[in-house]
Amino acid sequence: MLYEYILYLQGIELGYWKRGIPATLSLLKDAVKKKSAVNVSFSIFAKSAIDNSDKKQSTKDNLHTTLAVLHDFRSGLDFKDLTYTFLRDFEQYLKEKGNAVNTIAKHMRQLRTLVNEAIKGYMHANAYPFRKYKIKQEKGRHEFLIPDELKKLETVEVEEESMRHVLDAFLFCCYTGLRYSDFCQLTPENFIRINGKRWLYFKSVKTGVEIRLPLHLLFESRALGILDRYPDIGSLAALPCNSEVNRQLRKLAGLCGIKKRITYHVSRHTCATLLIHQGVAITTVQKLLGHTSVKTTQIYSEILSSTIVRDLKNAQRKRRKVKIFPDKSLRTSDFIDNR
């Protein structure tokens, strides 16, 4: 009995050593009191931390994905293995697997989240590997559709019913800016009438922000035109999984001769870009999309070449109407404050 207890204590001590933590008497006492598991690896800890967290399921799924990639790189990972050199090696592994810079950055952020959890009791703070490691990220390009491409999608002939359904749902979100997750949760209760006009009210799944959309004022009520072709929003919003929807969208892009890589989220980028192209204030676009920061909206928006030409022509017309120097007797010095 005593021998088994000594082995148990030695196991706890070994577990602390693997985590890079000196096994002090107080730590051993605390571990015995809490009946801590012996020799818990980082991989086991991370899986348990994810499963028992109160994070959203989508966040948990992302963390589990990174954990699976980490397992492929090095299985049975211990806490003491988590060093700056390990992070560099993992980054190189991801590069060699053909991952883009921003995909690598996403995995490294997920790993950092798990390491931050481990620091709370499973790793020594001095062993924190992300202290010197900098996560590299590139400014991403947000794909969007221009009006001509939207027109092609609106007019393309689609015989397959499921593909037609996906196309209608995609176009609905091009004209409302909804995320896939928000669109799929819509019910008839989300639609209300104000002064006889239909508005869409919902709370974002991702952010919890309440969003109100006057559908009659967005893109000549095109979203309402699509909605009216279905018995109710429940029929339109009943989409297959995101990956299947994206597969159908790639087929549709091919039918229309659109070379861009279309995913469902392109509809949101398209909405933001076209609203700004129409001259809608970016702060209004922010509210319509439900962004908590206008900086996020600025990232989504793109300036079309036609917008630049339009704005410059407008400025040119204004200059013709206004005489910049109506009084020829004025000199340059007259514009200088000599105080």
Predicted regions mapped to residue ranges:
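Basic, Lys/Arg- and aromatic-enriched nucleic-acid-binding interface segment
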Residues: A105, A125-Y180
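Catalytic-site neighborhood detector that most strongly recognizes the C-terminal catalytic loop/helix
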Residues: F144, S204-G208, L289, S293-N314
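C-terminal catalytic core of tyrosine-transesterase DNA break-rejoin enzymes
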Residues: L171, Y175, S181-D182, R268-K295, ...
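C-terminal secondary-structure termini that scaffold catalytic or DNA-interacting sites
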Residues: A315-R339
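C-terminal catalytic core of Y-nucleophile DNA break-rejoin enzymes
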Residues: K139, V205-K251
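Basic/aromatic-enriched alpha-helical hairpins
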Residues: P22-K97
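N-terminal DNA-binding recognition helix of tyrosine site-specific recombinases/integrases
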Residues: E4-L7, V69-D72, L77-L82, E96-P129, ...
